[in-house]
Design a protein with these regions (language model features):
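Amphipathic alpha-helical "lid/sensor" segments that cap RecA-like P-loop NTPase cores
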Residues: 24-62
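Accessory nucleic acid-recognition modules appended to NTPase machines
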Residues: 48-207
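Catalytic cores of nucleic-acid endonucleases
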Residues: 190-191, 214-224
Length: 224
């Protein structure tokens, strides 16, 4: 008789949890630090950016590459790593499996669309990414609408930037999405003829429309 077990998801720390944790260890943290490097608490064992990056890269290699490659017996390791990196650096963006395949096939000539779809499923099953659909009053229509991908932690994006040009806007949107999940909201996207709202969050029969912006200096951002 096989043993019984209960599976539950453990997420990186929310911003509130990071503040509480840093208070306990007498360590200062700024909001921007969290927007860039996220909520894995063990990173605070390191005092400089380079050491923090090395730790997070090692963590990523262990969780994403080593574990998943072994678990799913992935043969096309180079292609898998390129696809994973492409996905993680494009968090908080509209995507489809076809668009990912189109962008990656120049680097991986022998990769098929079905393989890209499989790799996406592996990342979702491992809780590395979340995929959320566009809101629709008709459930069947969700299949034809676009989706967005959000990373379990924004550090997976920041590890891939060049010249310290961190993707603050998309990371901030990613953090808001994760915070909504922590708080128990059901989250979807909304786009009606180009009138986009980042999130429709529902909980206890209440609906909240949420637009995320790092700055509203841009007129289009302000109008939205």
């Amino acid at each position: 008789m096989s043993g019984r077990f209960v599976s539950f998801r453990i997420r990186p720390f929310s911003y509130k949890e990071i503040l509480e944790f840093c208070n306990e260890i007498n360590r200062e943290i700024t909001p921007m630090d969290y927007v860039i490097w996220g909520g894995f608490p063990a990173r605070f064992n390191f005092n400089d950016v380079e050491s923090t990056k090395l730790y997070l890269e090692d963590l990523e290699n262990t969780i994403i590459f080593n574990d998943l490659i072994k678990r799913y017996n992935i043969k096309k390791i180079i292609a898998f790593k390129k696809i994973v990196s492409y996905i993680l650096m494009n968090n908080s963006r509209v995507y489809s499996s076809r668009s990912i395949h189109k962008n990656i096939k120049n680097q991986c000539e022998n990769i098929s669309l079905n393989t890209v779809i499989k790799y996406l499923e592996y990342l979702k099953e491992a809780y590395i990414i979340d995929e959320i659909p566009q809101y629709s009053t008709k459930a069947k229509k969700e299949l034809s609408y676009y989706c967005k991908i959000y990373n379990a932690d924004v550090c997976f994006n920041s590890l891939r930037v060049n010249n310290n040009r961190y993707d603050i806007d998309h990371n901030l949107e990613n953090i808001v999405y994760n915070e909504l999940l922590y708080m128990g909201y059901n989250v979807k996207l909304y786009d009606n003829a180009g009138k986009e709202i980042d999130f429709i969050a529902t909980k206890n029969n209440k609906v909240f429309l949420i637009q995320v912006a790092y700055s509203v200096v841009d007129e289009k951002a302000y109008q939205r």
